[in-house]
Amino acid sequence: IIDKKIDLPELSFDKNGWVTSARWKGMDEPLFTEGLADFMVVHFNDMDRWSQGDIYMHMDEVQRIEKFNEITRMEWAKPKSKAKVRETPYSWIVSQDMEHPRVKNMNRQVEIFKEVPRAKVNIFFDRISSIAPEVFYAKFPFPQDCRQPVATNGGIPYELYKEQIPNSCKDFFVIDSWVKYEAEDGARIWSSGDVPIVSFGGHHMGMRLQDAPKKENELYGMLYNNLWVVNFCVDSPGEMNFEFDLTYREGKQSVEQLTDMADSYYIPMSIVNTPEALEDPVVHKYLNTPQRLTSGY
């Protein structure tokens, strides 16, 4: 037996024991920064969903921002208890119960891997029924020098905010599965098989952005939207679970490599009791093929 020695990542924690950064050997900056998996709800005081569209479309920038500030309110989840840390042979799992007036039984968890620069995030909550307009977000902050995110839509990569059709939407983006940030020390990749809609620098409601926001390094995944009238139910209560992966890569990575990596992280392992007969080619073909959520948007 050979005793394998590895360079463990440097971790930091807040006063409640939640992890605020993780940096592996060879990285100048951490994989993520303080605020990982913070949960936020945008509330709307105006129950008329259609009025939001009128404000967005027909007011000038100053009027629009003033009006949205008047009718909206942001509310962040708070720690319900100290975070708990459990060590496995290959990782640390940090788990913390959270509380927010709009959900019950909320928990966030991150698994920090020892040998590879990777963090697996899980957010769980039980949404309380309500028809009031509201939007749920999860925050993923990266180092400040992480700029110019790249993503794919329909398998086609492009630089967000730059390589877009003029006057197309820059408030939020529908992605296939991953977002890549380039930095001086390497790339950081955010991926999810559950959340295909993201924004940057904050929530996207009423923004009408023309350029990239100041805090482009802060990614927000939209978990639930009770405001939109298209493709979202007006009220979907009950338990919801979302998974994300944050990884670091040195050197250039092709779109195919990033997609394969992201797909491999959120495909559950399938165990098949193989009979004596040959495997079915159709079953084998689709067994490990992720079904992308973006097809419904």
Predicted feature residues:
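C-terminal (or distal) subdomains of carbohydrate-active enzymes
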Residues: 1-297
